[in-house]
Amino acid sequence: MFLAQEIIRKKRDGHALSDEEIRFFINGIRDNTISEGQIAALAMTIFFHDMSMPERVSLTMAMRDSGTVLNWKSLNLNGPIVDKHSTGGVGDVTSLMLGPMVAACGGYVPMISGRGLGHTGGTLDKLEAIPGFDIFPDDNRFREIIKDVGVAIIGQTSSLAPADKRFYATRDITATVDSIPLITASILAKKLAEGLDALVMDVKVGSGAFMPTYELSAALAEAIVGVANGAGVRTTALLTDMNQVLASSAGNAVEVREAVQFLTGEYRNPRLFDVTMALCVEMLISGKLAADDAEARAKLQAVLDNGKAAEVFGRMVAAQKGPTDFVENYDHYLPTAMLSKAVYADTEGFISAMDTRALGMAVVSMGGGRRQASDTIDYSVGFTDMARLGDHVDGQRPLAVIHAKDENSWQEAAKAVKAAIKLDDKAPEITPTVYRRITE
């Protein structure tokens, strides 16, 4: 039997906690036998003293085991259970293509996703722009969709990693969110509860990233890869660029439209293509569906070219109560904003920098995201035809097309876009889309 205050004291004094102590504390968070003050105190001691790798693995597994852990054995699936997690960005619509692409190559992708947070868009919010789309199918239905379609993207239910919800709520109000062991456990507890064989982590770097510096993004990626592999799930991470909007669009319906166009081959933004392919390659190799990079790329290109990936996306939408002909008629189903017009720079020049976070917040301000959980979302608003770093803009080439609910909202967004995009008289050096691959 342990005492919560003795566990806090031990960590406060700089000692490592045992697996049993960590499990006792996490189960107490779940069972409400540990107070908010005690959670805050432990979070702060971890913030200042860090955690060893064994402690990090124990914390993550205890949080994972605080609720249901999915088990797929009874379905006798003929392929690996694989998933991807992103630290979030703007125009980061990779999940909507990646899930169907990997499923079309023989993987099974039970993606439990999130809503928008701060300036970053949420995959669930994007999917809810599709009429009727059900992000909370019951457990049996979720399993059926995975077996039949190969991919489902759903919301987190209260049975998955329940200790994380309470732990996170306390961290949020006690300035202990930005601790790498706590971030790692929070992310992985939910992902590992999916019962995965393999995971790829997309850790963003740059002006729209969750972590403020390249070094901290790399440290988070290394921590996640170390802990997930320590917990028995083959995991790699990619550090990818978020110094500009990833897709050509940012918003909800506008990003779904771009995802469908990507899958059907109508339009593929080159940077979005690079990141999506790189993440899919990791999933195929870690899931043992491909031996190496070249084989993985060939398989992925084939399911894009032969229409299989687009077909899987359509089947997923239909299975989750969306329209059965969504891929063919997406424009008919997706909401469009009242006002769509381009915004131009006041001077001409090359785009040298973008405050991606500010662009994400501009979408939120237009109604495309939530400032608090109770807010409703306007799925139709956002940006399309986003200019990229290095582009030359003038009176002919706009910075973006803004989709807004009225003139006032358009003006506010136009001001935000102009302020977020910096021009120079010479083209900047273009940063890579994928900086680094982390395997241990």
UniProtKB/Swiss-Prot annotation:
This protein's encoding gene: deoA
Protein family according to the UniProt entry: Belongs to the thymidine/pyrimidine-nucleoside phosphorylase family.
Broad class of enzyme this protein falls into: transferase
GO-annotated biological processes: pyrimidine nucleobase metabolic process; thymidine metabolic process
Entry protein name: Thymidine phosphorylase
Catalytic activity: thymidine + phosphate = 2-deoxy-alpha-D-ribose 1-phosphate + thymine
Keywords on record: Glycosyltransferase, Transferase
Lineage top rank: taxon: Bacteria
Subunit-level organization: Homodimer.
SMART domains the record matches: PYNP_C
GO CC entries: cytosol
Function recorded in the entry: The enzymes which catalyze the reversible phosphorolysis of pyrimidine nucleosides are involved in the degradation of these compounds and in their utilization as carbon and energy sources, or in the rescue of pyrimidine bases for nucleotide synthesis.
Keyword Cell wall biogenesis/degradation included in the entry's annotation: no
InterPro entries: Glycosyl_Trfase_fam3, Glycosyl_Trfase_fam3_N_dom, Glycosyl_Trfase_fam3_N_dom_sf, Nuc_phospho_transferase, PYNP-like_C_sf, PYNP_C, Pyrmidine_PPas_bac/euk, Pyrmidine_PPase_CS
